[in-house]
Curated annotation (Swiss-Prot):
The gene is rplQ. One of its GO terms (cellular component) is cytosolic large ribosomal subunit. HAMAP family: Ribosomal_bL17 (MF_01368). It comes from the Bacteria. InterPro entries: Ribosomal_bL17, Ribosomal_bL17_CS, Ribosomal_bL17_sf. Part of the 50S ribosomal subunit. Contacts protein L32. It comes from Anaplasma phagocytophilum (strain HZ). This is Large ribosomal subunit protein bL17.
Amino acid sequence: MRHGVSYRKFSRPTAHRMAMMMNLAVSLVTSERIVTTLPKAKDLRSVVEGLITIAKRYSQKDPVCGRRLLLSRTSGNSSVTNKLLGVLAQRYKNRNGGYTRIMKNGFRKGDCAPIAIIELVDREKDLKVIGS
């Protein structure tokens, strides 16, 4: 029975699954929009929202501790940590969760897997379209 299990295994060992999720999270934070399969997007949402919440929490009260925590969570990627603490923490300071949007995008041609676009809400490109 799988009572209380809140993640998918993706037919991968634990270390591979965690590395895959962190690589997807780094890609999403840097480009703010990626295309992946629907189950991966649904699991990625909780990872990215956790990173943004950590950045919001620590950006004002203890930035050094927050930077160290985010560096350990993002495999030492300093550009992603800087973007989380600088840009994204300020962008979402008045939003309590719900930082990502998942849109279904049909099926993959080879194996008919459901494809989704996951993106950060209130992106700069979205704001330019609304403002013009």
